[in-house]
């Protein structure tokens, strides 16, 4: 039987669009990741009408639903079998995500052990190759 998360408030995002760095689309050398504009004449910093919004604390998530995934769990990174034992007591609050650098053989063992312990995994069926015998 699938593990259900603890009941929580409805997750409401105050803003779903990403905050993009000012003029990052005009210059290839500027990455699009957010940087606060600090220029004395900058129209985004001065909040002129028609300009993009600046990131500020008012856009933050509700504290009760912060870090929640859409499935209702919080994510916990699993790097070895001992990390699964940590989730045993909190399997209704946290779900595991197997780290990207885990080998397929160890990953298969982790998925099997998680099913025994009743721990939910977000990427249980990723990077699983079935070998064909010739």
Curated annotation (Swiss-Prot):
<keyword id="KW-0687">Ribonucleoprotein</keyword>
<dbReference type="InterPro" id="IPR036351">
    <property type="entry name" value="Ribosomal_eL32_sf"/>
</dbReference>
<dbReference type="GO" id="GO:0003735">
    <property type="term" value="F:structural constituent of ribosome"/>
</dbReference>
<protein>
    <recommendedName>
        <fullName>Large ribosomal subunit protein eL32</fullName>
    </recommendedName>
</protein>
<dbReference type="GO" id="GO:0022625">
    <property type="term" value="C:cytosolic large ribosomal subunit"/>
</dbReference>
<comment type="similarity">
    <text>Belongs to the eukaryotic ribosomal protein eL32 family.</text>
</comment>
<dbReference type="GO" id="GO:0006412">
    <property type="term" value="P:translation"/>
</dbReference>
<dbReference type="Pfam" id="PF01655">
    <property type="entry name" value="Ribosomal_L32e"/>
</dbReference>
<dbReference type="InterPro" id="IPR001515">
    <property type="entry name" value="Ribosomal_eL32"/>
</dbReference>
<keyword id="KW-0689">Ribosomal protein</keyword>
């Amino acid at each position: 039987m699938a593990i259900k998360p603890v009941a929580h408030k409805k997750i409401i995002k105050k803003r779903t669009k990403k905050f993009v760095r000012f003029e990052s689309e005009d210059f290839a050398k500027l990455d699009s990741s957010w940087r606060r504009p600090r220029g004395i004449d900058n129209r985004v910093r001065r909040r002129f009408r028609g300009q993009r919004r600046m990131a500020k604390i008012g856009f933050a998530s509700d504290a009760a639903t912060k870090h929640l995934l859409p499935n209702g769990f919080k994510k916990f990174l699993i790097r070895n079998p001992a990390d699964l034992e940590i989730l045993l007591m909190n399997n209704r609050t946290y779900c595991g995500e197997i780290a990207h650098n885990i080998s397929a053989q160890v990953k298969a063992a982790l998925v099997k052990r998680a099913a025994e312990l009743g721990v939910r995994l977000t990427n249980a069926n990723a990077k699983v190759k079935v070998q064909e015998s010739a």
